[in-house]
């Protein structure tokens, strides 16, 4: 490699390193700001298991400026796309995944579910119980997402947490 090529490579790497540092600092600033805004609007939302500032902000954006327009937890679940859709035919009675709703909110609830599945023993036993009932893992995860939406609804309205301790018997 020629010395001018080496110098150009070093210069380019230094520029890229500075850019990475600047972007990392910008990301940290934005994360602090998101945390501040979420804490100012719905601090109890951050108390939910598996919820971070990014996920909470996504759910707040989905609920909008007037979360009271969501008349029930079912309307919130439908808005997030975690409400199952009837897909029965003849003697077969079943429900399928809803492809409607806010996909970002659906993805946020999915991330909450994955976080809980990894770290929360109650959620793991809930999923195993649903699978033992004859549901596929995918269907059990869909049930879990619906329960999470049910649990998040009062938090979005600013009501006290109904408690994740209800998970095994309520869901």
Positions of predicted regions on the chain:
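A detector of single, family-specific signature residues
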Residues: 1-171
């Amino acid at each position: 490699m020629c010395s001018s090529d080496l110098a150009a490579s070093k210069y380019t790497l230094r520029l890229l390193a500075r850019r990475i540092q600047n972007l990392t600092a910008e990301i940290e600033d934005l994360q602090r700001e998101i945390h501040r805004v979420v804490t100012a609007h719905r601090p109890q939302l951050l108390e939910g298991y598996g919820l971070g500032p990014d996920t909470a902000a996504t759910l707040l954006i989905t609920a909008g400026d007037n979360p009271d327009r969501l008349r029930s937890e079912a309307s919130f679940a439908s808005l997030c796309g975690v409400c199952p859709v009837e897909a029965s035919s003849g003697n077969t009675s079943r429900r399928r995944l809803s492809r409607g709703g806010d996909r970002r909110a659906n993805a946020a609830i999915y991330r909450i579910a994955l976080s809980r599945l990894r770290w929360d023993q109650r959620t793991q036993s809930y999923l195993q119980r649903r699978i033992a009932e004859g549901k596929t893992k995918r269907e059990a995860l869909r049930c879990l997402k619906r329960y999470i939406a049910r649990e998040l609804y009062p938090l979005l309205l600013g009501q006290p947490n109904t408690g994740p301790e209800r998970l095994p018997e309520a869901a």
